[in-house]
Amino acid sequence: MKILIVSGFLGAGKTTFIRRLSRNIGKRFVILENEYGAAGIDGARLGKDAAEEGNIWEMTEQCICCSGKKDFASSVLTIANAVDPEYLIVEPTGVGRLSRIIENLKQIEYERIRLLSPVTIVDIYSFGRYLEEYPELYKDQIASAGTVIVSKTEQSGVEEKERIRKFIEKINPSAQIITDPYASMAREEFENFLKEEWGGGKIQKAETEEKLPDVFSLETVSMETPEKLLCFLEDMVCGKYGNIIRAKGQLQAGTDFLRFDVADSRYTVTGAEEKTAGKAAFIGELIKREDIEENFKKEARGRKMKYMARKAP
């Protein structure tokens, strides 16, 4: 079993990349998703693409680079022995240190479990902000990768992409850097991610612990109308509910079932693939939990609420 780690900070596009990868590789694989504190929102999206070729394993209560590393190692060994896929694709939480995940996997690596060259995805729009606000973590994810993919570059010019490339090269001179949209990649290019084994490069060691965002999750939620959801998201990106850098959820709004996604100061709303119980997760600092909860239908409030203050993994 070969293991490909797809790392990246909050909202960089890891799940979208994995969906694109799964549609192109034509191999038997399993996806291990570590969606810490986010109520498993992305599992269904990945599951639709992996249903025929593999399975989805979710770890939503712990970070696989720190507190949950023993469970993570156990899950990897279980997948290798019970499922025995050709490939395991690992999607860590966006606030996990890639270097520590690599260290954890190296401890259980043997002739039947091999680590492929890790991939890190960075958002071209949020690159500067996250590099400034979370430098240790952000640099760790870039420096520990074999390939760095710059996402959301469809509307970016050559100069902007080259500027980001130079920043990345300073952090990781040996990385392959891709700035063209991965939506335009050929099948052969996706298959190359499954061929290059990790060469045992230098693993970054964090000298200091870094304060990371808090996570606030809600389950069994709904909204009165789609319009109210749009107003809620607009207020969120304007800072009304604290410094929210990432949010996502799926819920019923009126008669519609919708999915929302917030990354930095941008948001999208699309139709949900399945009609499931409403879930939402918010990541950031100084989160105004009660104000957020007030936006949802009264009968849904307080049924199940989860709040976690994260420390640096």
Regions found by a protein language model. Name each.
Residues 282:
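Flexible loop/N-cap segments at domain edges
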Residues 31-33, 149-152:
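Short internal beta-strands
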